[in-house]
Amino acid sequence: MSKDFNYATGRRKNAVARTRLYEGTGAITVNGKPYEDYFPRKTLQMIVQQPLKLTKTLGKFDIKVNADGGGVAGQAQAVRHGISRALIEIDPELRSILKRAGLLTRDARKKERKKYGQPGARAKFQYSKR
């Protein structure tokens, strides 16, 4: 049995995007909704489309994404990461284009934990000398 899709996982902050690329017409669905509805802001839509535009594959693949965790921006960037990884599985020659644009690098920055004895991760309670 041959698989009819390419699978990749993208991550950003606490968001995880499990991405499947099928041969198709260019429909992108995120959690069962068209990506335009799931990411209503144009900037987030551009983030999702970025790997497809760079590799000139916009309209060649149907993409189904299951996005979990994090916020909307983190999910959009996780989707971009997942699409980029899946495109390499299909055509390894696209790797140099995506690598140059920095779309294959997992952005490891996460929220720093709050420490005890402080109101936040780095902030300190106000110091009173007297």
Curated annotation (Swiss-Prot):
Keyword Ribosomal protein among record annotations: yes
Keywords associated with the record: Ribonucleoprotein, Ribosomal protein
Swiss-Prot/TrEMBL GO biological process terms: translation
Ranges for region Disordered: 109-130
GO molecular function, one term: structural constituent of ribosome
Protein name: Small ribosomal subunit protein uS9
Annotated gene: rpsI
Annotated family: Belongs to the universal ribosomal protein uS9 family.
Entry GO CC: cytoplasm; small ribosomal subunit
